[in-house]
Every structure is written in structure tokens, then in C-alpha cells.
Amino acid sequence: MNQHDHLDKFTSAWLTNYRATEKAIYCCEHCFGCCHLAVHATYPEAVAVAEGLTGTQSKRLTDYIERLKVALTELTDLKSYLKKHRQELGPCPFLDGQGSCSIYPTRPLSCRALLSTRPAVWCTVDFSKLDHWDKQAYESSLDRQVVAWPTHFVAATQDFGRELENTLLELMQKEKGWSLSGNFAVMVWLEKNSQLSKHHIATNQQVSDILTAYELNNHLLLDLTCGSQGTKSAE
């Protein structure tokens, strides 16, 4: 996928310049703190992964979807959803038993763009439980010229990643008349089970009906944009 190549080249150049200032990025192999976050992606990225799933990956994915559907019965707002996802739903279903990404070559733009300027422990901290002094110490340690404040993740790579995501969604909108983004694992599962990308869909309602049939037409999970005017659709 060309957008992935563009981001990888951009990130490589950015890292070279950043490390030349003797500053560190703490991401490394078998570090998977960020894999507990709800990963946002575009549907074309999910399609690319769904096409090559192994039996083990499919099983882990289905287990995750079942846990997620149960959790959604208790959630109504984005903040609660993101917190529950991070703390209770378990890591990304594509994380293998050794703590490595099993879809690394085709991982989405949002994963590629996430670079940590602080040690891994900060990627899993529940900031709502930190006292005032710990929060203050954390914030004072951040380089505001580099990070997406108030997080410790690099802003430049995330900004470029979002630009590339928008390009993918615009291309999908032009080709199909609708576009879909949101929870990456949910979209991979949806494509694996419904082959939505291969449907000949004549109306926006058909897309919404398919999401509803799979119990996934939820604004916390997916963002469906329909029609030439870019109308948003979600329950």
C-alpha cells in the first residue's frame, strides 16, 4: 500500500533527524504497551489484513469481537469506551504469544505513526489515577515542540499519518460512494465475515444495514460516511 510506504519513509527521515539531537524514541521489538489502545484505521487497510488471516489470528479476532460486543452494552461515551478498551478488553488480537505484531508488514498507518518519546511504562499508565505531582512531573518532561500535547507521542508522524488516512478515505468515497473508518480489529473481522468490500452496494442504507446485521453499527466503533456530500451515518 503506497500510503504505508510514504509514511515509513517520512518516519525514517524524521527519526534520523531526531536521533541526531541525541534524543531517544523508546519503541522497540516486543514492546506492546500501545497495543492495548483502540487502534483507529481505514477500511482499505482492514481489507488488506483480512485477506491474509491465519486460523489462529481469526480465532483471536473473534474472541476479541465477542468481548467487545459485551462491553458495548455498558458504554455510551467515547471516553468510557477508550478506558475500558485499554484496561479490560486485552491487547490487540493481532499480538502474538511473544509480544510481537503478527501483521507487522501490513499494520495500519496509526500504528506506524505512533512513536513514544517516553519509556514504555508511560504507554500503559492510567493518568486518572496519578496524583498532581506525578502528572506535573510527567508534563514537564515532555518536549512540546515534538509531542502531540498532552501525550508523549510524536506529533509529526501522527499528523502525516492522518493525512494519508484521509487520502485513502477520499479514494474509497470516490470509488464506492461511501467510506468507513474506526476500530481496526472490528473492520478486519467485518471484512473477513461479510466481504463488505466486494459487495455491489447501490444505496447508503445497504451499508448501514450490513453493519447493523453484524451488530457493529455503533458510533463508538465505526464512522460511516455516505454519499457525495459526505453524510455521516451511525446509530
At which residue positions do the language-model features occur?
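Short loop/turn segments that flank or connect secondary-structure elements
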Residues: 1-100, 104-235
